[in-house]
């Protein structure tokens, strides 16, 4: 019972300290367009050195053309500061990025169209219930004719009223 109050307080303290520790770190800027990945170093300056391949640098930005979606560790050094990033970007040539508003709009439009079709089907089927027209080439139907009962199968012998055999009738037997 004594640990109920300190545990939430300890959790809050850990969140505040963790956020303060992460707040000082600068982040890489990553842009993905088709199969091209452009990475900008968080350190500003003209003497930024990139690893693993310093040849892929244009205007202090590390540009990977035709990236094959394989994981890659990229690091940049500006002066005495070194920043390292693990890049695991999935890229494709014909991909399009959709924002949340577009996806929600597509789903809402689909639901509205479906609801409209349901309402149309309901109203059109409601009006057709009582209407029944005879087709052009059909003849009027007569009342259902009664058929005679089917002929009994000659393979089975009918049960006679006076017969008292074991299988002559249905009897209740207790097991």
Curated annotation (Swiss-Prot):
It comes from the Eukaryota. CDD domains: Ig_ch-CD3_epsilon_like (cd20933). This is T-cell surface glycoprotein CD3 epsilon chain. One of its GO terms (biological process) is cell surface receptor signaling pathway. Residues 133-163 are annotated as: Disordered. It comes from Gallus gallus. Residues 146-173 form the ITAM domain. Gene3D superfamilies: Immunoglobulins. The chain crosses the membrane at residues 101-121. Its main location: membrane. Residues 22-100 are extracellular. Residues 122-175 are cytoplasmic. Residues 1-21 form the signal peptide. GO terms for molecular function: transmembrane signaling receptor activity. GO terms for cellular component: alpha-beta T cell receptor complex; external side of plasma membrane. The CD3 complex mediates signal transduction, resulting in T-cell activation and proliferation. Required for normal immune responses. It is a single-pass type I membrane protein. The gene is CD3E.
